[in-house]
Amino acid sequence: MKRIICPFLCILMLITTISFAACGKKDGETPPSLKFGLGVYTNVTKASDADGDTNGQGKVAITAAAVTVGADGKIASCVLDVADITVTYTSEGKAVANDSFKTKGEQGDAYGMKAYGGAAKEWYEQRDAFASLVKGKTLEEVKALVADANKGTDEVINAGCTIMVKEFVLAIEKAYANAADSSANAANTLKLGTHTEQSCKDAVDDKNGQNQTETTFFAAAVDADGKIVAATSECVQVKFTFDNTGKSTYDMTKKLQGKREAGDSYGMKKYGGAAKEWYEQADAFNAACIGKTASEISGLMGADSYGNADIKDAGCTILVNGFVKAAAKIG
């Protein structure tokens, strides 16, 4: 009898083990979807007068954060960058064009925190350390990482980030608030591209000149094949003004918002007669990017810098070159 029961029990145990194993996660099973959002914090730090041979300056730091957030309210992934922009104008009221614009992250080692500032790590390395640190934290836990003088707590410093982090946190706070249901998941890679364009106008008689920049941010979750599964964007316009003597006429008390952040108050429908508001048109462009690689997005733009026929039919009639050039950088 024992000889019959023993083999039977062994077979039963084997079947049970296989059954339990089959109940686990299957190979290739898609991870749960995550919320996805982009936040931008803008800080104008200077608008000085020109004086003789010394040009006047307009300075602005635009900090962007993209995050994915799990069902538990914790940040699953985060990417950060800062567009640190300086424009100038002369004492004759002439705007000076910049050769190019690069974010702090794009500058890499050339930013020079190690070479010129004596820092142990370059800016992008410290940025990455902070972005890694916020993973797995709630928003309140992230906000608690800011200490005196806008620098990080000991936890932040020990992680390798000794730079000021307050504006990172302010951008993350906006990204968290903007996070919405998406097709992004933990298997995807979060990416952020930035493109800045400049337009200059000299002062003439009693008409102010301007040195204006428009910085477009394109954030995306990308799958293993490099295809976009979720996308969003923002654009910040900063217009530094001055008179024909190079004296700044920029209002430093003015609160700046991104075009998406401004919502309906941006006024494309009310004042420009557009069928859709800026954020609605941007959403139409972003939707057209789903399933495409960064290089394929360039095909969405025509020779006139507007969208192709499909983009226009989808409701995006604004210039899309900023979106396309920012998106190209996530490749």
PLM region spans:
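Positively charged n-region of N-terminal signal peptides that target proteins for export
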Residues: 1-11, 21
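Sec-dependent signal peptide cleavage junction
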Residues: 16-32
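Active-site- and interface-proximal helix/loop "cap" or "latch" segments in soluble metabolic
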Residues: 30-331
